[in-house]
Structures are given as C-alpha cells and as structure tokens.
Amino acid sequence: MDGRVVLIHALLTAVCSAAVGKFGRDGPHGEALHNEVLLHEGGGVASVSATAPLLGGIVEKEGGGAASGDALSELPRVAFLSKPQGPVTPKKKGNGNKRRKGKGLGKKRDPCLRKYKDFCIHGECKYIRELGAPSCICQPGYHGERCHGLLLPVEHPPSTYDHTTALAVVAVVLSSLCLVIITALLMFRCHKRGVYDVENEEKIKLGITVNH
C-alpha cells in the first residue's frame, strides 16, 4: 500500500512541476511563479519542491507518521502560490498627445480665418508667412491693399474728327471739280462767240463789197 501511495505522489509531483513550469513561462510579464507546491492530505499540509526528482521522494506529513487509509481518499490537493507584484501605475499619455496635437494645429492654422477674417473688403485673404502679413486677391473691378477701391469704367465718346475731316476733303474736291467745269464751259462759250463774231464781220464786209 505504501508503494502505491509513493508512486501516486511521485506522478502528481511530476505533473505539478510541469504545469508550474509552463504557467511560469506563459504568465504576464514573463516572471517565474513561486516554485512551491502544497499538498493537502487529510487535514495535514506537506511541502514539496517543484523540482524534486520523479522517483524516490517520500512526502511526509507535518505531524509525522506513515500514510494510511484508502488511496483515492488520500489524493493530494494541489495549490499554486505566486509572488505578489507591486501595483503598476499606468502612464498618462492622453494629455501629452492632446497638447502635441493642439500645438501642431496652432502652427498650421491660417491667420486669415480668425485674426484677418475681415481684412479684405472685396477680395480673398492670403497670408504670406515669409513676410508675416496678409495680402488680398481683389475681385474684378476693385483695387487697393484691402480691395476697397472701385474702378469705374470710363466710356470714351466716338471721335467725330475723322468724319469731319473726310467731309471737308470731299467738299473741297467737289468744289474744285465744279469750278473746273464751270471755267471750261465759260471758255468754250467765249471761244464760240468769238468765232461767230468773226464770221458776221466777214459777211458784212462781203455784202458791202457786192453792193458796190
């Protein structure tokens, strides 16, 4: 009967050591657990090392004496003890990120949206970072630093000088032509009258001579 109890204890010790080793490797933060296994047997407590050899170790009760009773009723109860860990205070990263985001937005913010919102009266504001001053892109028909000046279209009346000159030239040409024609007619008439007078004089002379 003692041999069976020893064998069962050895097998349970091996299983517990394997489980403790695996749990220690897979636990959070990779820390090893306490390497001690407590065996509860019939009201007594026995301490067994997790690295004990598989065969040859006999678990003894604190009160001493050999194990007795049924093997099924004397199966050990296994409990694991772990080292207490200190409280971990989480780092506050939210405020830092918000501050950084706020600073980044402040650098990229366009002053024309707030400070120089009403700088351009009739145009679009454009902030020039190299000069550190705003500039205005004026709408058609406006000018000035703030697009406050209005350009009024000036209509030039059609010039009548060219028409007058042309009419004067045409009048002079027509007048000259008329004068030339009139002069030619007068000369032709005078010439014809002179020829007629000469013929009459000759006829008169011839008539006088015939009468004599």
UniProtKB/Swiss-Prot annotation:
Residues 1-18 form the signal peptide. Residues 82-108 are annotated as: Disordered. InterPro entries: EGF-like_dom (IPR000742). It comes from the Eukaryota. Residues 189-212 are cytoplasmic. Residues 108-148 form the EGF-like domain. GO terms for biological process: cell chemotaxis; cranial nerve development; epidermal growth factor receptor signaling pathway; ERBB2-EGFR signaling pathway; ERBB2-ERBB4 signaling pathway; positive regulation of cell population proliferation; positive regulation of keratinocyte migration; positive regulation of phosphatidylinositol 3-kinase/protein kinase B signal transduction. Residues 90-106 have a biased composition (Basic residues). Keywords: Cell membrane, Disulfide bond, EGF-like domain, Growth factor, Heparin-binding, Membrane, Receptor, Secreted, Signal, Transmembrane, Transmembrane helix. Residues 153-212 form a propeptide. The keyword Signal applies. One of its GO terms (cellular component) is extracellular space. GO terms for molecular function: epidermal growth factor receptor binding; growth factor activity; heparin binding; transmembrane receptor protein tyrosine kinase activator activity. PROSITE patterns: EGF_1, EGF_2, EGF_3. The chain crosses the membrane at residues 168-188. Disulfide bonds join 112-125, 120-136, 138-147. Residues 19-167 are extracellular. May be involved in macrophage-mediated cellular proliferation. It is mitogenic for fibroblasts and smooth muscle but not endothelial cells. It is able to bind EGF receptor/EGFR with higher affinity than EGF itself and is a far more potent mitogen for smooth muscle cells than EGF. Plays an important role in the proper development of cranial nerves by inhibiting the migration of the cranial neural crest cells (NCCs) into the odd-numbered neuromeres (r3 and r5) of the hindbrain Plays a role in mediating v-Jun-induced oncogenic transformation. Interacts with CNIH2. This is Proheparin-binding EGF-like growth factor. The lineage of its organism: Eukaryota, Metazoa, Chordata, Craniata, Vertebrata. The gene is HBEGF.
